[in-house]
Each structure stands twice: as C-alpha cells, then as structure tokens.
Amino acid sequence: MAESQLNCLDEAHVNEKVTEAQAAFYYCERRRAALEALLGGGEQAYRERLKEEQLRDFLSSPERQALRAAWSPYEDAVPAANARGKSKAKAKAPAPAPAESGESLAYWPDRSDTEVPPLDLGWTDTGFYRGVSRVTLFTHPPKDEKAPHLKQVVRQMIQQAQKVIAVVMDLFTDGDIFQDIVDAACKRRVPVYIILDEAGVKYFLEMCQDLQLTDFRIRNIRVRSVTGVGFYMPMGRIKGTLSSRFLMVDGDKVATGSYRFTWSSSHVDRNLLLLLTGQNVEPFDTEFRELYAISEEVDLYRQLSLAGRVGLHYSSTVARKLINPKYALVSGCRHPPGEMMRWAARQQREAGGNPEGQEEGASGGESAWRLESFLKDLVTVEQVLPPVEPIPLGELSQKDGRMVSHMHRDLKPKSREAPSRNGMGEAARGEAAPARRFSSRLFSRRAKRPAAPNGMASSVSTETSEVEFLTGKRPNENSSADISGKTSPSSAKPSNCVIS
C-alpha cells in the first residue's frame, strides 16, 4: 500500500493543504481536469475549463501541441491477444464489445512478469572509494583560449576508457564520438552501454547506417531505449521523454550538462559541460543502472541488417539448462544472462504467430501460458544436445588382445643393408621382401637374436616387440660417414635400442 494511503488510516493524520504560493506545491486536481478537457475536446474545451475553474493558463502553445501529440489511449491486452489468434475469416466478422478488464489479485505486485535486462558485458567495481572528488566546468564557447572545447573533452574521456563506458543521451547523432566508442569496444574490448530516448532511436540508427558498421565491431555494445515518466489519466496516457544527458567512464568520471552528442550542440548552440570525479560519480552510477533496468532493447543486428553472432541453436530445454548456474561449472561456453530468453522470443517470432495453446492459456494468465508452452516444448521440439568433441586419438583396433593404432599398420622394416651409392638396392632389383613380413609379426613373441658380429648395428627383439631399428653413432670430425649413415669401425660402437 502506498505511503499516502497508510497516512490516511492514521486517526491523528490531517491532510495539509498546499497552496500555489508554497514551494512544495506540485499537483492540482483542477489543472488535471483542464488537461483532460484539452486532450478530449481540444483548445476550446480547455479554455472553457480554465474559465470555469478560475485558473490561469498554465500551458504554453508548444506544450499544448506536444501533449496532444504524445497522448495515446489505453490498449486492452486481452482483446488484442484474441484478435491475433483468430483466422482471417473470423476477422471479417464484426468484433464484439470489449469486455471489462478483470481486477488483479495483487494490488501491489512484488514480482514483474518481464525479465530485468542484465549488464551482461560486465560492470566496474570501484568499491567505496572512487578517487579524489573534483568538479570542473567547461563551456561553449570556451572562456579561456587554451581551454578545450566540449567535444574534445568527451572524446578524450572515451579514448582513455579502460573498464566501461555508459552513455545516457536524448539525441545521439555525432559520428565522430560514436566512432571513438566503436573503436574502444572493438579494439580495447571495453564494454559499452548506451541508453537513448525512444524518439531519438531512429536518428541514431541513421547515423549507424552511414558508418557502415560490421557485426564484430558492435559485439561489445548494448543499446537500449527508455521513455519519460509519463502522465496517467483515466482516458489515456501521455508519454514523456528522456532529458538526462551524461557520460560515465570507468566508474570514476562523469561528464554531464546541457551538451548533447550532436554537431549543432558542439558548434552552434551555447552549452555547459560539468566534469565530476570521485564520490560525485556514485549517484550517476545508481541512476544509470535504474534506467537500464526499465529500458527496452534496441537490436542493432536486426535494425542494421547484420548477420549477428553465429551460434548453436539449442532447444528450449537445453537452453534452460545452460543458463543454470550449476551447469556453468562444466559448460565450456556460457551465454550471457538473458540471452536464452531473447533467443526463445526470436524463435517464436520466426515461427510466425503464437502457439496453438497460447489463446487457450491467455485466460488463465501469463504463468499458465508459460507452463503450457514449456510442457509442449518437451514433446514437440527436438532436443539438440551441445556438441562433444571426440578425444583426438587415432582409431584403435583390437588384435590378439592388444590395441593397435592405425598409424602403425603400414610400417615397413628398414632393410638390413643400406642402399648403395648408385641407388641399386634390393628393391630396385625386385628382390625386396614382401611388405607383410613386418605387419604379420608386429607383436609376435620371438626369441632374441644374437647380436650382429660386425658391431655396426644390432637388432634386438624382446618378448613384446619385433620392431627392428638400424642405429649408429653420429659421425664426428675425425670419422667419415658414407651416404648410408655408416661410420668407420674405429669411431662407432654398437648401440642397442630396446622397446619394452
């Protein structure tokens, strides 16, 4: 229950009357009624209401036009969901009168049915101390000849960023500043979060299209949009705008003021830019995270027609496992928080329409529809398990109770006599032994052969191996070696190579 309602329950509470002359004056019921007359009946009804309530005109002409343009009636979610589920034939029939919306079971819901967007790229952890607190004021035009202009101050902050870049702006169309942000995100791997006003998103996307960005350059950039607080009335809602403007870098520096990231603001208009450091940054840190939590996603990949990241397409069941913290211990590549839910939403949109059970579950609430969708996925959606790479070993075959690798099947024994200098060996004369002599008795048991009498090389065969090698001593400066690798008897000693 709201604090004002709790105060009304107190017997000793007396509502204090706040007049227009007091500084605490904020809300007036008579002005709200005049605003409803403006939105419902136009300028003439607004003037009549002011005369009836004996009020002075509290809205200027541009404000009246902007309020009428931002006003929109409420939309009933239940008839809209039913209309999407109907066929084209039923859509031609006259729609029935809208039913009254049912009351919610919870007057003050303590849990949202939407996912809170996470800061998946990371956030700076500055602790309790953020450095020395300083305040510096910059103006345009500069007061001092050597003072930097406002755009230079902003670009230097972005180019020196190492941890995180956070931007809150109502209108962002300066390509030079955004190019510095893209370079910081792509080259230095600095996480970038940008929050824009909903009305200024289309102009921001126009600037991005002119820069001809690629998918790998914006992977460390998250763009979201928010609206103003708004004004709610029984007949509709007036949508507000975002007027905050500040740039936070590394959690210890903030630039805020009237300066916006546009060419006109840095060359034509008069602006102020306040540079804050130290503990002065903490309120801006909190404000940015609160704005990010209520913001809506702006998909740059879809808006700019980019391919996006190439990843594996998991089913909904596997996706729920991968975002579980206990599976993160054994998963080699964990998706950022919230990525799987966005993937499920994209898959549903690509499928073309709502599931068959959505219309039936709409009457039971959002939770019933989610449960029904999950149970349906277990039966209908093919489960795709994450790929498992095999162990990089050679193919093994079973032979005589032992494992034999395929890499050793085609080995041939070296000839006992080295080829002659002219290359006319036994193989050239057609007198070479068949190749299967070695492979057929690779691991056969055989008695030891006596050592070669010449002492040049010895062939040793153990009980477990018959592999024979021709070994010798490396020739030195005083010894001579021929092309076969043999050395003189005076400098070579018998060497045995035993494989056990």
Swiss-Prot record:
Residues 82-109, 347-366, 391-500 are annotated as: Disordered. Its main location: membrane. Keywords: Acetylation, Cell membrane, Membrane, Phosphoprotein. GO terms for biological process: signal transduction. Residues 425-442, 458-468 have a biased composition (Low complexity). Residues 477-500 have a biased composition (Polar residues). Residues 397-419 have a biased composition (Basic and acidic residues). Changing A418V: In a breast cancer sample; somatic mutation. It is found in: Cell membrane. Pfam families: SACK1. Changing D250A: Decreased interaction with CSNK1A1. GO terms for molecular function: protein kinase binding. The modification N-acetylalanine is found at A2. Directly interacts (via DUF1669) with CSNK1A1 and CSNK1A1L. Belongs to the FAM83 family. All members of the FAM83 family of proteins share a conserved N-terminal DUF1669 (domain of unknown function 1669) domain of about 300 amino acids. This domain mediates the interaction with casein kinase 1 (CK1) isoforms. Therefore, it has been proposed to rename DUF1669 the polypeptide anchor of CK1 domain. This is Protein FAM83F. The lineage of its organism: Eukaryota, Metazoa, Chordata, Craniata, Vertebrata.
